[in-house]
Amino acid sequence: LNISRETLQKDGQVKLIRNSLEKKIKNELHAMLVNDREKYETFWKAFGRQIKFGIYGDYGMHKDLLSDLLMFYSAKEQKLITLDEYIEKMPEGQKAIYFAAGDEAARMGKLPNAQLVLSKGYDLLLCSEDVDEFCLQIMHDYKEKEFKNINSGDLGLETEDEKKAAEETATENKDLFEEIKKALNGKIKDVKVNPTLQDHPVSLSSEGGISMEMEKILRKMPAGGEGMESTKVLELNPNHAVFGALKAAHEAGDTDKINKYA
């Protein structure tokens, strides 16, 4: 028989068989997750990457089928958890699922915004595989809880008073911020005030659809990720001594000192 691949792909019965197999395999995997956690985690460590690619590869069309099989490492519990388990333990008032992307779990947990999220009593998913962030971004949310990368934009953790104070500080130091941008010579798009940085003097975040970790991954691809760069924002802690030193240097016209800090 000479049957083309295109003919098979369009055949209604083949589609029906494929969908039936997908559901059967999914149900078997979910039963393993529920009834034999140790066995499922062994399976996940071997094949979890393929499930994530299954969600990302078809632009999220199968996310409803596969998303409850996903597992990520929990910063609070120090073990693999599902998205359902994350949501079940969310404190009242938490509106998003927070995650960090990077190479090492230990390093991610020390990031300024990671410590902020954890200090609020919220858990943090530590995503160390290159496909993780692409998968979560294409999903956008899970059970109406939006995924938020801790290093991408507003985390929604500031109080109204903190927001107002940050706006006032930014207005008062507009010229200083422009000088810092100039000193960094195009490496950042903007300078902002972030009063939630606790003991950290600065933090680097990104805006838009491409994060700093995604940029690193894209650069490793054959095309080199040409034109796929993250939009970086320097965040300053207005309550830290470094900010005070920058202000003093600006007021004194000490450009060299600002360049040194930058």
Task: Provide a role label for each language-model segment.
Residues 1-262:
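Conserved GHKL (Bergerat-fold) ATPase module
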